[in-house]
Amino acid sequence: MTADGRPRIPTGILGEAPIRELEIALAGSIVGPGEPNYETARQVWNNAIDKRPALIVRAASTEDVARTIAFARRVGQPIAVRGGAHSAAGFSTCDHGIVIDLAQLNDVQVDVGSRRALAGGGSTWKIFDAATQAYGLATTGGLVSSTGLEHWSRWLRAWRRCRPSGPEVRPHVRQPSVRRVGDR
């Protein structure tokens, strides 16, 4: 809410109460049409893609992701997940739906003993390389430093440039809960 009590985000088709409820539940923030930073927040790498989401949720935790997915299901809105915002086809954004921006989930934890790294969904190759190179480790990805890790991972596995064990994945399924799936 603004100082004068008006909704901070134009509510459009979603309604004020559901958006306010989501905003209170999140550790991250919400950006909507009409806000000063909306135009910048909705941009993706491919300038030919000009979509206007109803909301952009800047997730600060995996719980924010789960809550946003549950919210989108409840209000019947499509979602797009943005990691590095490098989808040439525009899959990291949507018109009139909800974009879950993972940029803040960019931590990288390196286990030197096993020579593995666990990276957040918003990690870019620049962040990943800096974390792994500190331990003398390198990877087969990262052709463009601002590209999100998810952008290349499926292609690299297809070309057998990555180890078949692959990364750990934390899918968000029917229930608004976080599940952890790993290869070991």
Task: Give names to the regions the model predicted.
Residues 108-109, 166-184:
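Active-site and channel-lining beta-strand-loop segments
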Residues 1-165:
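N-terminal accessory segments
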